Swiss-Prot record:
Pathway: Siderophore biosynthesis; alcaligin biosynthesis. This is Alcaligin biosynthesis enzyme. One of its GO terms (biological process) is biosynthetic process. It comes from Bordetella pertussis (strain Tohama I / ATCC BAA-589 / NCTC 13251). Belongs to the lysine N(6)-hydroxylase/L-ornithine N(5)-oxygenase family. Its cofactor is FAD.
């Protein structure tokens, strides 16, 4: 047993906990440990499609919105890997998924507080020492381990969600999370169907559409959504993923929060507008060239999925929601781009009674992201959609959340936590009267002689 007592141990190393590790590593006197059963950092490897990009700009890296001077920033990664000038010349603020993964792997290799290949199998509470024991097994050697800590952070991520009618044991369908691993096998089928409407579904459809000229498959994209809608990214709308809105959202009654989330799908479930346009343009070219192998259909809910192993075909039953009419669909290959869901990890079963639970069995998450009854010992990442809203899965918000979590874990605000970030109001005035803001008194400004305009961005000295 390791006799060192850590200030906190974090379980799971995805982007959110990797951000927390990056922000906590420089803090003197703060002893931390991050554990993951994988052999190294690997973020959605099945969706590292060549043309796929993040929907956040590069500033939403692991650290910059909390500490722009951090050695773990994306720009420092570019500088130290001799890529900063090529990135500057590209003038593209959106990273590919593959580039973001390379950046995260670069950071992970430099952090001293990460331990991969550690399968956490149990978490116990020791009331005498007021500490937690994190136990498990090294995946390579099989050797047992035990670490003691005062606090915990759970960042185990989400699991592929499957519709209730789809039984993985009975049918060899593919979830989009595993798409690349099965792509070439899939392209050997006579027909392929994608079910789902979000970014992942669009990326898979676009990838198969681009390469369909080299193959003979027919391609269908079917979704329950009423349309193939784009993700909203206008500036005032984006303030709904600001710290100010998160505070406002958390204070609303739970029933109202549930209603609001159903209205905000386009904030976090939509498709990048440029990708929608690329799909349309490519479809238009193919149709005008006489290639009509493609079907897109909305308002269609999957009700049943059967697989015939002799014919190696899927038989799908749908219900068209607008017309209230059923229809069937046969296909040789099936990709379910049906999103992800959170599962309670079995390793925390021994401390179940120390955690606050909602009636539906989910965590009751406090404003500070704590889930224990005291609100000060056990914290979670990326499981608070109902409690904190659409900022929960957003990469750009992780620095703000981690700055808050670090303050709760250590008792010190190591990184400034902004309290006023939005240009708009979300709550009505407390006194019931909305007043105009006072006009700013005009200041006399010095007169400067006019100078010729020039493009200083491209100026050469």
């Amino acid at each position: 047993m390791n006799r060192e007592i850590y200030d906190f141990v974090a379980i799971g190393i995805g982007p959110f906990n990797l951000s927390l590790a990056s922000l906590s590593a420089p803090l003197r006197g703060v002893r931390t440990l991050f554990l993951d059963k994988k052999s190294g950092f690997d973020w959605h490897p099945g969706m590292l499609i060549e043309t796929s990009t993040l929907q956040n700009p590069f500033l939403a890296d692991l650290v910059s919105l909390a500490d722009p001077r951090s050695e773990y920033s994306y720009l420092n990664y570019c500088k130290l890997t001799n890529r900063i000038y090529s990135y500057y010349m590209r003038e593209n603020h959106y990273l590919s998924r593959a580039e973001y993964t390379r950046y995260c792997q670069w950071v992970a290799a430099r952090l001293p507080n990460l331990r991969f290949g550690c399968d956490v199998q149990g978490v116990l509470h020791d009331p005498e020492s007021h500490s937690y024991l994190v136990t498990g097994q090294h995946t390579m050697s099989g050797q047992r381990f035990m670490f003691r800590c005062r606090k915990l952070v759970l960042g185990l991520g989400s699991q592929p969600y499957l519709p209730a009618c789809c039984d993985r044991r009975a049918a060899p369908f593919i979830h989009s999370a595993d798409y690349l691993r099965h792509k070439y096998e899939l392209q050997g089928r006579a027909s392929i169907t994608i079910v789902g409407s979000g970014q992942s579904a669009a990326e898979v459809f676009h990838d198969l559409l681009r390469e369909s000229g080299r193959h003979d498959y027919s391609l269908a994209w079917i979704t329950r959504s009423p349309r193939f809608f784009q993700m909203e990214n206008t500036k005032l709308t984006l303030e709904l993923i600001s710290p100010d809105y998160t505070e406002y959202f958390h204070d609303l009654p739970e029933a109202r929060r549930q209603e609001i989330l159903t209205q905000q799908n386009s904030l976090y479930k939509g498709i990048n507008a440029s990708l929608i346009n690329q799909i349309y343009d490519l479809l238009d070219e193919k149709v005008h060239d006489g290639d009509n192998r493609y079907t897109l259909l909305t308002n269609s809910e999957l009700r049943a999925c059967r697989y015939d192993p002799l014919q190696e075909r899927f038989q799908l039953d749908f219900q068209h929601l607008d017309c209230d009419r059923p229809f069937s669909h046969a296909t040789d290959g099936l990709v379910l781009a049906t999103g992800y869901s959170h599962e309670i990890p079995a390793c925390i079963n021994p401390i179940h009674d120390r955690i606050a639970w909602n009636a539906d069995g989910s965590y009751r998450i406090g404003r500070n992201y704590a889930i224990d009854h005291e609100g000060s010992e056990i914290f979670v990442q990326n499981t608070g959609l109902l409690s904190h809203g659409v900022t929960n899965p957003d990469l750009g918000f992780c620095c703000y959340r981690n700055s808050q979590i670090l303050r709760e874990l250590t008792g010190t605000e190591h990184y400034r936590i902004e309290t006023r970030t939005a240009l708009q109001e979300f709550s009505p005035p407390a006194d019931g009267v909305l007043k105009h803001r006072p006009a700013r008194r005009a200041e006399r400004r010095p007169t400067v002689a006019a100078r010729p305009l020039m493009d200083i961005h491209r100026a050469t000295l």
